[in-house]
Amino acid sequence: MPKAREWWSNLYKDFLALGIDGVWNDMNEPAVTDDDIPEENRIGTMPYDTPHRGGGNLPAGPHLLYHNAYGRLMVEASYEGIMKVNPEKRPFLLTRAGLLGYQRYAATWTGDNWAGWDHLKLSVPMSITLGLSGQAFNGPDIGGFLNNTDADLWAHWLGFGVFLPFARGHACAGTNDKEPWAFGEAIENTSRIALERRYRLLPYFYTLFYEAHKTGVPVMEPVFFADPKDLRLRSEQQAFLLGDNVLVIPAFAENPVLPYGIWENMTLIYGEYSDKYQAKLKIKGGSIVPVGKVIQSTTENSF
């Protein structure tokens, strides 16, 4: 209902007055804890026949109709509430649920993944698919949300995860610590190199996000965007492009299918290619990629 969305939107003024810069709308399908229901009967949300009143241009209907729309309407209300308070500042909003058009208001992530090599490898095609579906600002929980993560898995994941549009490490309560410094000095150094590489590429990311905002072209592209006529590239799910000019090849990739042409190694940080976990970066011949300095926080940037 419009009145409910207005009520929700107005709640943000109190949060933002505390100095909060970003908001995360989580479990907004909405999720329902149903542990007391037999597993085969769980649906994870409210019963599908739960009525929604609608309102405005929206008809009344069951939750089966509104399940995805609920998250979409929620993030729109959240966005409007943030903009009321800070109209001169671009808001950061993250959502788990949404529907067509929600990319105008919020970033998203790929859900509660597992700490395992299969989910690490799925990160690339899942993020590419979200981008092709209109949601340019997306990425997985680096390191895996559920289950424990070992040092090797974490380092491999972060080594390419820093080049995903939304780069974030996350963990479920009850799993092991998954901070960049949690796996010893060597992996801490690996993490530092990876994060500094992303910081240096922030001007390029900024440009790609602006282009995505204006045109809908994703930030993270499948490699066949380099040459749509090259049928070899259609099935590649390990390497990916950042815009037209940067090719990312994760360290885990085995015999990736790469586009023809001139692609030169791109160096951003001293020692990056002596670290086995870092993704290889290649710059397209004849192109220009803007890069910045190594910084400690995005607040040090002028854009």
Q: Across the structure, where does each feature detected by a protein language model lie?
A:
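Edge strands and adjacent loops of beta-rich recognition modules
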Residues: 287-303
